[in-house]
Amino acid sequence: MSSIEIESSDVIRLIEQFLKESNLHRTLAILQEETNVSLNTVDSIDGFCNEITSGNWDNVLKTVQSLKLPAKKLIDLYEHVIIELVELRELATARLVARQTDPMILLKQIDPDRFARLESLINRPYFDGQEVYGDVSKEKRRSVIAQTLSSEVHVVAPSRLLSLLGQSLKWQLHQGLLPPGTAIDLFRGKAAQKEQIEERYPTMMARSIKFSTKSYPESAVFSPDANYLVSGSKDGFIEVWNYMNGKLRKDLKYQAQDNLMMMDAAVRCISFSRDSEMLATGSIDGKIKVWKVETGDCLRRFDRAHTKGVCAVRFSKDNSHILSGGNDHVVRVHGMKSGKCLKEMRGHSSYITDVRYSDEGNHIISCSTDGSIRVWHGKSGECLSTFRVGSEDYPILNVIPIPKSDPPQMIVCNRSNTLYVVNISGQVVRTMTSGKREKGDFINCILSPKGEWAYAIAEDGVMYCFMVLSGTLETTLPVTERLPIGLAHHPHQNLIASYAEDGLLKLWTD
């Protein structure tokens, strides 16, 4: 990843803003003096201008004390303040401002005549507004001062230093560099770096989650930040689990109150947003809902996302769109803001089984039980290429881009005993096979976070573990005696979830 250069002056300004918001004004003044870097920010430019045009000079002068402004503009400001004080017959205050403020001391040095006229105005026993203001009214002068000073200041979002620190911690959590739910010693950086775990295939079951006798998980996924394991079940419930103990997350208020997220039909697919804050779910009745995981609130619903069941959902990189594929053979893009279908991509002749955005977000990849993979232009929706893998038109079940592969490659899982590593043009680079003919056809495939291992679950209830680089089958692991449905991989640990029609969601570790 290319390095990002940060100006030292910007870092100083972040500290200065923190000092200002913490009312550490003396420290702020010393830092500005020693570094010669000024903050020059106000909470609101409109508010700053309103203070000037309203003549709230106490607030104005307090604000400009922490700003670095051109001497001429400061002299004009202080001169006008003195004039208004004289008009109000606040003569003692006017003398104090004229004799003890830096802008007026500077004025006395560089323009003695102008300063003398100001002193004369203070000493007069009367105030003649017509003589002082002339054809330019007091209000007009205030407006001019407001306009000239506003061009020197900026508005910055509050608490930028704390916000950036929070964002950096969130990024480290997303990358697996911080353990979820752990208190962080920010200064000492005790948890700032976590040893990278060597990717290894699982060898044993850690725990299992049992569903009700009339239900079973149709889908499951870990959140990118590793905080959640979410399942979607045959009866429409969407549940958030603590994968460390296999219990329902009761720290989520809505689950503690038995007010679960729910759809009207079986939840066929689930996908998290990149920041792990939102969850998209698709059901067999053609509906999609988007949830806020922390609260369980439904943020957006697409009641007619597809005319038949929804088989796959994905968030766009910026969370502004939902990509979906359905049993109606159509790939669609839905707008989060509008709640409407923005784009349709037709061409598949059977069920859509998986949809993906390419890593850069410019392309959409879809696969279908018609045995084809299509690459679409992300903006126009035009089909750029169509290809198939293998010698037979086996139904393709899912495609997974291989992380950091150059040139880009992906793993294709179809209803056979072989996985295919292909490039974006569909050329087969490598194959991985179970070698089993009877009940050896794969149903679902996942990749480890770094792309070193591919795990495929077959009709026989066995998980096959392949090393991607060599394509060799390293080990097998029986995971269910009933019909398996799918797999999900933890984003940072050697932890895999398997789910099947036996009503068990099992967690496997090394």
Curated annotation (Swiss-Prot):
All copies of domain LisH, residue ranges: 7-39
CTLH domain segment(s): 41-93
A Pfam family recorded for this sequence: WD40
Annotated localization: Nucleus
GO BP annotation list: embryo development ending in birth or egg hatching; locomotion; mechanosensory behavior; mRNA splicing, via spliceosome; muscle organ morphogenesis; nematode larval development; neuron development; regulation of alternative mRNA splicing, via spliceosome
Positions of WD repeats: 212-251, 260-301, 303-344, 345-379, 380-423, 425-467, 470-509
Tissue: Ubiquitous. Detected in the intestine and germline in adult hermaphrodites.
PROSITE patterns per UniProt: CTLH, LISH, WD_REPEATS_2, WD_REPEATS_REGION
Molecular function, one GO term: identical protein binding
Outcome when changing I15A: Mildly reduces homodimerization
GO cellular component: nucleus; precatalytic spliceosome; U2-type precatalytic spliceosome
Segments of this protein annotated with the region Required and sufficient for interaction with smu-2: 1-181
Keyword terms, alphabetized: mRNA processing, mRNA splicing, Nucleus, Repeat, Spliceosome, WD repeat
Keyword set includes Repeat: yes
Broad class of the protein's primary localization: nucleus
Residue pairs linked by disulfide bridges in the UniProt entry: none
Purpose of the protein: Involved in pre-mRNA splicing as a component of the spliceosome. Selectively regulates alternative splicing of unc-52 exon 17. Thus, smu-1 mutants selectively suppress the effects of unc-52 nonsense mutations in exon 17 by promoting the accumulation of unc-52 isoforms that lack exon 17 and enhance the effects of unc-52 mutations that affect the exon 16 splice donor site. In contrast, smu-1 mutants do not suppress unc-52 nonsense mutations in exon 18.
Domains: entry comment: The WD repeats assemble into a seven-bladed WD propeller.
Quaternary structure and interacting proteins, as annotated: Component of the spliceosome B complex. Homodimer (via LisH domain). The homodimer interacts (via the N-terminal region including the LisH and CTLH domains) with smu-2, giving rise to a heterotetramer.
Assigned protein family: Belongs to the WD repeat SMU1 family.
Stated name of the protein: Smu-1 suppressor of mec-8 and unc-52 protein
Source species of the chain: Caenorhabditis elegans
